[in-house]
Curated annotation (Swiss-Prot):
Species assigned in the record: Parasynechococcus marenigrum (strain WH8102)
Positions with a binding annotation for thiamine diphosphate: 72, 113-115, 145-146, 174, 287, 370
Name of this chain's protein: 1-deoxy-D-xylulose-5-phosphate synthase
Catalytic activity: D-glyceraldehyde 3-phosphate + pyruvate + H(+) = 1-deoxy-D-xylulose 5-phosphate + CO2
The organism's taxonomic lineage, starting at the top: Bacteria, Bacillati, Cyanobacteriota, Cyanophyceae, Synechococcales
Single GO molecular function: 1-deoxy-D-xylulose-5-phosphate synthase activity
Gene name per UniProt: dxs
PROSITE patterns linked: TRANSKETOLASE_1, TRANSKETOLASE_2
Quaternary structure annotation from Swiss-Prot or TrEMBL: Homodimer.
Length: 643
């Protein structure tokens, strides 16, 4: 069977084991071909190919529900549920999404992008099924990294108290989330994985026996019986944890043995309550480079399949904001032993991997546990440390109560670095950092800021650590603008003071963070059309520099705000409210992300669709204030703006 001809996943039912192994090969080939060309998540999907096929052999996918945690391990699922021929559009505008979307396929039963949600969703579906007297299977597939998240453990605790509610949880145990998972539960799983019985089951012994000249490639029945006995020796160490929580535990089993998994899943379906099947897989299975470097090949930009090396960009790029942050924090930690960097399982993504290598005793990884990370930092601050918590903007949403209750109310000197703030591109709506301006500006005691470039980032980090109260610093995804960087000796900025970058009489632009340089480009376009423009780098959201903004607004009488975040409750709203509070009633245009979810595309494509690139913003300004003159949109290569 060729997967391009598959019209429904149930058509895989009844295939021989050898035929399923051929399907697995096709899945891996297509997966590697597409991700090596366009980028995407590589290791997670390669590790669950056989798991996916074995599980789906035991389900009726017209009726049964499968919830994939996070979604980055679901590429094989997509390839056998109608998206094989369109898979080359992965993570591209209007193409196949990198995560699960209910709107994309009837087989995507629950959308995802953040970790640890699958068991809660599957349990909710199972309870709804029982409430309606229906009969279908509910399955959650979750990785060992996501299982460290508190939400997953809360769901397990709940499900364990419902002994007559059938629910299957498949634990995909590859000892990796993005970085290696941390915590006591991960240690329990790791001890089971590394125990002599499981090492025996790892496949090396089996391969050795299979290649004995007198075996003819076959395995004796005695070896299979011995494998079963050895597995039972490993069960008490890990299975007891889940059994005590009310689950029937099955495993650990080889996550690349389709036949064994099919038999186990069928047995699990016959159980009348919650069951956890523990499957041990290898992240990156089938691609040697990904197997050898499971962190580096978790997600990849385009790369050469033969060498495994990333395809270099056509021209060198400045260092990323994340890297500049990481390098600067290393220096600050070396200078001050009270400074501690904290990550929630995203060391490489946030730049804290540099701190882990350079000053490991001032580095903490809490796993996928954002709420814990925030309150842990609060406790450290109470005892005189200066914690710096680096978390993606989209993931800090999960700890909003802790920001208020544990840090804000107590006015503790904790610094938050919100990475991937703004438009992130191909990861789509679950990962856009569009809400942090809105959710941070309402918390009393916080000082909130955003740099216009990587050099200002360095000064802002020092500003945060010098301030005796909670601070938040947002940085965008990707490279800086190429500003020269200092190795040390950074000066703190005055709190609440903006920066006047250029002066003019016709228009005032107040820009925040990553929108400052686009604002300057927009001002240049307007200047060429005869419109003299003042540009302010706001620097601070809380407190806003009213002493700089208000007099200029009164004089110029036309104001534009620019932000790479949601307009609802955002930076523009803060400026508008500030002017209104002082009875400054003037025309104001807010440019940012409107009230909508931003789908997957390149950052440039997303910004074009939101009318946030300079030529579009110049045209919006011209029309909003009826300034006449040049039609910027008509002269641009981008679609004209509809008035």
């Amino acid at each position: 069977m060729h997967l391009g001809d598959l019209t429904h996943p149930n058509e895989l039912h009844g295939l021989k084991l050898s035929e399923l192994e051929d399907v697995a090969r096709q899945i891996r080939d297509r997966h590697l071909q597409v991700v090596s060309t366009s980028g995407g998540h590589l290791g997670p999907g390669l590790g669950v190919v056989e798991l996916t096929l074995a599980l789906y052999q035991t389900l009726d996918l017209d009726r049964d529900r499968v919830i994939w945690d996070v979604g980055h391990q679901a590429y094989p699922h997509k390839l056998i549920t109608g998206r094989f021929n369109d898979f080359h559009t992965l993570r591209q505008q209007n193409g196949v999404a990198g995560y699960l979307k209910r709107s994309e396929s009837n087989f995507d039963h629950f959308g995802a992008g953040h970790a640890s949600t699958s068991i809660s969703a599957a349990l909710g579906m199972a309870m709804a099924r029982d409430n309606r007297g229906e009969d279908f299977k509910c399955v959650a597939v979750i990785g060992d990294g996501a299982l460290t998240g508190g939400m997953a453990l809360e769901a397990i605790n709940h499900a364990g108290h419902l002994p007559e509610t059938p629910l299957l949880v498949v634990l995909n145990d590859n000892d990796m989330s993005i970085s290696p998972p941390v915590g006591a539960l991960s240690n329990v799983l790791n001890r089971a994985r590394l125990s002599p019985p499981m090492q025996f089951l790892s496949g090396s012994v089996e391969e050795s026996v299979r290649h004995l000249p007198f075996m003819g490639g076959e395995l004796p029945a005695e070896l299979n019986r011995l494998k079963g006995s050895m597995r039972r020796l490993a069960v008490p160490k890990v299975g007891a944890v889940f059994e005590e929580l009310g689950f029937t535990y099955m495993g650990p089993i080889d996550g690349h043995d389709i036949g064994e998994m099919m038999r186990t899943f069928q047995a699990a379906h016959r159980d009348g309550g919650p069951v956890l099947v523990h499957v041990v897989t290898k992240k990156g299975k089938g691609y040697p480079y990904a197997e050898a470097d499971q962190v580096g090949y978790h997600a990849q930009s385009a790369f050469d399949l033969t060498t495994g090396k990333a395809i270099p960009s056509k021209k060198p790029k400045p260092a990323s904001y994340s890297k500049v942050f990481g390098q600067t924090l290393v220096k600050l930690c070396e200078q001050n032993s009270r400074v501690v960097g904290i990550t929630a399982a995203m060391a490489t993504g946030t730049g804290l991997d540099l701190l882990q290598k350079a000053v490991p005793n001032q580095y903490v990884d809490v796993g996928i546990a954002e709420q814990h990370a925030v309150t842990l930092a609060a406790g450290m601050a109470c005892e005189g440390l200066r914690p710096v918590v680096a978390i993606y903007s989209t993931f800090l949403q999960r700890a909003y109560d802790q920001l208020i209750h544990d840090v804000g109310i107590q006015n503790l000197p904790v610094t938050f670095v919100l990475d991937r703030a703004g438009i992130v591109g191909a990861d789509g709506p679950t990962h856009q950092g569009q809400y942090d301006i809105s959710y941070m500006r309402s918390i009393p005691n916080f000082t909130v800021m955003a740099p216009k470039d990587e050099a200002e980032l360095q000064r802002m980090l020092v500003t945060c650590l010098n301030h005796d109260g909670p601070t938040a610093l947002r940085i965008p995804r990707g490279s800086g603008v190429g500003m020269p960087l200092m190795e040390e000796g950074w000066e703190a900025l005055p709190i609440g003071r903006g920066e006047l970058l250029r002066e003019g009489d016709d228009l005032l632009i107040v820009a925040y963070g990553s929108m400052v340089h686009p604002a300057l480009d927009t001002a240049t376009l307007l200047e060429e059309a005869g419109l003299s423009t003042t540009v302010i780098n706001a620097r601070f959201l809380r407190p806003l520099d009213q002493a700089l903004i208000h007099p200029l607004a009164r004089r110029i009488r036309r104001v534009v705000t620019m932000e790479e975040g949601a307009l609802a409750g955002g930076f523009g709203a803060a400026v508008l409210e500030s002017l209104s509070d002082q009875d400054i009633s003037i025309p104001l245009l807010r440019i940012g992300i409107p009230d909508k979810m931003v789908d997957h595309a390149t950052p440039q494509q997303s910004k074009e669709s939101l009318e946030m690139i300079p030529v579009q913003m110049a045209e919006r300004i011209r029309r909003r204030f009826d300034l006449g003159g040049r039609d910027f949109a008509g002269a641009a290569s981008v679609p004209a703006i509809q008035s």
